[in-house]
Design a protein with these regions (language model features):
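Generic hydrophobic, helix-prone segments enriched in Leu/Val/Ile
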Residues: 12, 37, 66-70
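Short secondary-structure junctions
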Residues: 15-23, 77-81
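Short amphipathic alpha-helical segments
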Residues: 1-8, 59-63
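Intrinsically disordered, low-complexity regions
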Residues: 10, 15, 33-36, 60
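C-terminal basic regulatory modules in eukaryotic proteins
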Residues: 42-102
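Amphipathic alpha-helical segments
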Residues: 4-20, 71
Length: 102
């Protein structure tokens, strides 16, 4: 199991006005799903961000600025890596997530 700086990631996300709802492996899920944060295993001081395909451009720009400002205060960086889609799987209580890198 790899060490990932979840505490600092949570601080950055909360400072940007959002709440962590769930973590799974290298992914951090945010309340209302405007973004998914992924730990960068190649650069421990970087967090990769994927925007929900349904997130409006103006909202995405505000979120990006808040995340980058909060990360900089903690000597971290944010890399906007792509978008993601979420869909309910048929017949089961599972969600499928597709990361769509730029």
């Amino acid at each position: 199991m790899k060490f990932r700086p979840l505490g600092i990631a949570k601080e950055i996300i909360q400072a940007a006005g959002m709440q962590v709802t769930y973590t799974y492996d290298d992914l951090v899920f945010i309340e209302h799903s405007p973004v998914i944060v992924q730990f960068d295993d190649e650069n421990k001081k970087n967090l990769k961000v994927y925007f929900n395909v349904d997130c409006e451009t103006a909202a995405a720009e505000k979120i990006e600025k808040k995340l980058k400002d909060a990360a900089t205060e903690r000597e971290f960086t944010i890399t906007i890596t792509g978008e993601f889609e979420m869909a309910q799987k048929r017949g089961v209580e599972e969600i499928e997530i597709r990361l769509l890198p730029y």
